[in-house]
Amino acid sequence: MRLKLILYFLILSCYLGIGSARAATLMHGVANTWNSFSDNVSQTWNDPQTFDLYVPAVTWHNRWTYDSDKIDKYNERPWGAGGGISHYDEKGNWNGIYLMAFKDSFNKWEPIGGYGWEKTWRPLADPDFHLGLGYTAGVTMRDNWNYIPIPVLLPLASIGYGSATFQMTYIPGTYNNGNVYFAWLRWQF
């Protein structure tokens, strides 16, 4: 009996030790990610390389996830405007801080502001052509949610030439809610 208790104690100690090492590794990874994120935001804010104009271009409600009577009522022309600042890091990746307002699906004003990051590729011999893939983290407010601030974390993709970039995201959702492709033009000055 005593031997079994000692074995259980040793096994539990080893298991907890491994768990502690995994937890420490996870916490280290989270801390590194947060430090990288906050450093990028700070550098973009303190050392912008360009000023940006944002012009919303298209909103598309995924036809496979909406009833046609809902789609017929929605606005898919999100006119509006916004501004921001951009910084390209030492790896050539885009970092941006932005604020934009546009007409949402219900034709009501929706502001959004935040930080965006994209890994940038220049796959052609022409260095002006670029592709990007990344994320945006920010806050938006909608009329149908009484303009309560809503945090957002969304994917970003882009294609551009020189100072003009067509940037886009997809807002996931459920049936008749979310599942919206949203795109805008971004000009850097």
From Swiss-Prot:
The record marks 70 as: Role in lipopolysaccharide recognition. It is found in: Cell outer membrane. It is an enzyme of class 2 (transferase). One of its GO terms (cellular component) is cell outer membrane. The active site is at residues 61, 104-105. The keyword Signal applies. Keywords: Acyltransferase, Cell outer membrane, Membrane, Signal, Transferase. GO terms for biological process: lipid A biosynthetic process. Residues 1-23 form the signal peptide. Its EC number is 2.3.1.251. Coiled coil: none annotated. The record marks 175 as: Role in the phospholipid gating. InterPro entries: LipidA_acyl_PagP, OMP/PagP_b-brl. It catalyses: a lipid A + a 1,2-diacyl-sn-glycero-3-phosphocholine = a hepta-acyl lipid A + a 2-acyl-sn-glycero-3-phosphocholine; a lipid IVA + a 1,2-diacyl-sn-glycero-3-phosphocholine = a lipid IVB + a 2-acyl-sn-glycero-3-phosphocholine; a lipid IIA + a 1,2-diacyl-sn-glycero-3-phosphocholine = a lipid IIB + a 2-acyl-sn-glycero-3-phosphocholine. One of its GO terms (molecular function) is acyltransferase activity. Pfam families: PagP (PF07017). Transfers a fatty acid residue from the sn-1 position of a phospholipid to the N-linked hydroxyfatty acid chain on the proximal unit of lipid A or its precursors. Belongs to the lipid A palmitoyltransferase family. HAMAP family: PagP_transferase. Homodimer. This is Lipid A acyltransferase PagP. It comes from Erwinia tasmaniensis (strain DSM 17950 / CFBP 7177 / CIP 109463 / NCPPB 4357 / Et1/99).
